[in-house]
């Protein structure tokens, strides 16, 4: 039975990427060594790192003045590293979910040590993060404005580039490469690579170099973006295998036609699942329709059918649907529609939903 992987992360990977990665595990770039054991200082991996950074820029049409880093530590480390490098007096945030909450928490911890302020402009916590706040103004007297573009747990997404003179910092862990973005509007974009780029273990940072070096506090080398830029992401041993797989994924994106093609594919997948939810007699969505994520579709049973949730979870699993259980803070179900998920998988899930509904 074919399995359909809707897991929220680590993400589904394309079969061609997996086959290439499997081959490299036995013989990487003709070295006779596994990519899992090759030295990161070898010229073969140096070429991988360089190509990965350059292709990242190419896919997003990154202008001059930006650098791409592949680091360890995940987005969770960036929650502290970003304010450590950028926050001088004040940073502004909007709180749209768990990961934004964590970013705010770590920024506040940083200010407790080094001074500065954290201002939360708006929050959707009052309705369990089921919408994106819109009634706020981005101040111009802050060092930067931070937001999380896609909220995997709650299924909301900010699919626009804010137009402001204030420096923009975005956590794009779960929707990077899912749509075109105007990189010139951002000063720093970061995220874990395990949603839309590769396996867990790598973290990407896209940073405008002229925003760095402006804080007067001492920075540990491992948390200093300028050190990592100077060392081409190899100040310490990088996540070799995740970077290799990320490169193969980005090559596949390029072969498909780039980010605009990926966006069309993602919109088509999202339309399928949301149409099924909206037309259902037993399922309903959990967030404001205008704020729906094209990466993570969250839904629950309508109140009168709540007792069927466990039955549907078992039924869907028996039909090959993997990873559709919703986060414990929301409940219900979540279908993650990351770039590598084929539309056939979404069609299969919709068929399963309709089959189950017909029984009840």
Swiss-Prot record:
Q: Which reaction does it catalyse?
A: O-phospho-L-serine + 2-oxoglutarate = 3-phosphooxypyruvate + L-glutamate; 4-(phosphooxy)-L-threonine + 2-oxoglutarate = (R)-3-hydroxy-2-oxo-4-phosphooxybutanoate + L-glutamate
Q: What InterPro entries does its record include? A: Aminotrans_V_dom, Aminotrans_V_PyrdxlP_BS, Pser_aminoTfrase, PyrdxlP-dep_Trfase, PyrdxlP-dep_Trfase_major, PyrdxlP-dep_Trfase_small
Gene3D superfamilies per UniProt: Aspartate Aminotransferase, domain 1 (3.90.1150.10), Type I PLP-dependent aspartate aminotransferase-like (Major domain) (3.40.640.10)
The primary location reported for this protein is cytoplasm
- Entry keywords, A to Z: Amino-acid biosynthesis, Aminotransferase, Cytoplasm, Pyridoxal phosphate, Pyridoxine biosynthesis, Serine biosynthesis, Transferase
CC annotations in GO: cytoplasm
List residues modified as N6-(pyridoxal phosphate)lysine. 195
Q: Which residues of the sequence carry a binding annotation for pyridoxal 5'-phosphate? A: 75-76, 99, 152, 171, 194, 236-237
Q: Which cofactor does it need?
A: pyridoxal 5'-phosphate
| Positions that bind L-glutamate | 41
EC number of the protein = 2.6.1.52
Q: Name one Pfam family in it.
A: Aminotran_5
| Biological or metabolic pathway of the protein | Amino-acid biosynthesis; L-serine biosynthesis; L-serine from 3-phospho-D-glycerate: step 2/3; Cofactor biosynthesis; pyridoxine 5'-phosphate biosynthesis; pyridoxine 5'-phosphate from D-erythrose 4-phosphate: step 3/5
**Domain of life the protein comes from:** Bacteria
Q: How does it assemble?
A: Homodimer.
What is this protein's function per UniProt?
A: Catalyzes the reversible conversion of 3-phosphohydroxypyruvate to phosphoserine and of 3-hydroxy-2-oxo-4-phosphonooxybutanoate to phosphohydroxythreonine.
- Supply the name of the protein: Phosphoserine aminotransferase
């Amino acid at each position: 039975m074919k399995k359909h992987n809707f897991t929220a992360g680590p993400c589904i990977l394309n079969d061609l990427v997996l086959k290439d990665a499997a081959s490299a595990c036995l013989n990487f770039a003709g070295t006779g060594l596994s990519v899992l054991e090759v030295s990161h200082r070898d010229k073969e991996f140096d070429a991988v790192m360089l190509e990965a950074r350059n292709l990242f820029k190419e896919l997003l049409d990154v202008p001059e003045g930006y650098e791409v880093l592949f680091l360890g530590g995940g987005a969770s480390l960036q929650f502290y590293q970003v304010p450590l490098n950028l926050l001088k007096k004040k940073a502004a945030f909007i709180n749209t979910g768990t990961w934004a909450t964590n970013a705010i928490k770590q920024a506040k911890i940083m200010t407790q040590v080094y001074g500065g302020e954290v201002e939360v402009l708006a929050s959707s916590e009052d309705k369990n993060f089921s919408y994106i706040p819109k009634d706020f103004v981005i101040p111009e007297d802050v060092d930067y404005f931070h937001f999380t573009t896609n909220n995997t747990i709650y299924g909301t997404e900010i699919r626009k580039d804010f137009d402001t003179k204030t420096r923009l910092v975005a956590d794009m862990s779960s929707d990077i490469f899912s749509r075109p973005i105007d990189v010139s509007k951002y000063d720093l974009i970061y995220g874990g690579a395990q949603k839309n780029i590769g396996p867990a273990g790598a973290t990407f940072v896209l940073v405008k170099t002229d925003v760095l070096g402006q804080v007067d506090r001492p920075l540990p080398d491992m948390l200093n973006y300028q050190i990592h830029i100077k060392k081409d992401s190899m100040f310490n041993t990088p996540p070799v295998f995740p970077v290799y797989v990320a490169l193969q994924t980005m090559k596949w994106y390029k072969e498909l036609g780039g980010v605009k093609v990926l966006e069309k594919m993602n919109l088509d997948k999202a339309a399928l699942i949301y149409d099924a939810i909206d037309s259902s007699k037993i399922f309903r969505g959990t967030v404001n329709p205008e704020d729906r994520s094209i990466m993570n579709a969250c839904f629950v049973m309508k109140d009168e059918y709540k007792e069927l949730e466990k039955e549907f979870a078992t039924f869907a699993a028996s039909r090959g649907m993997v990873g559709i259980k919703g986060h414990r803070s929301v409940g219900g179900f979540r279908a993650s529609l990351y770039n590598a998920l084929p539309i056939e998988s979404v069609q299969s899930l919709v068929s399963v939903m309709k089959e189950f509904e017909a029984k009840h």
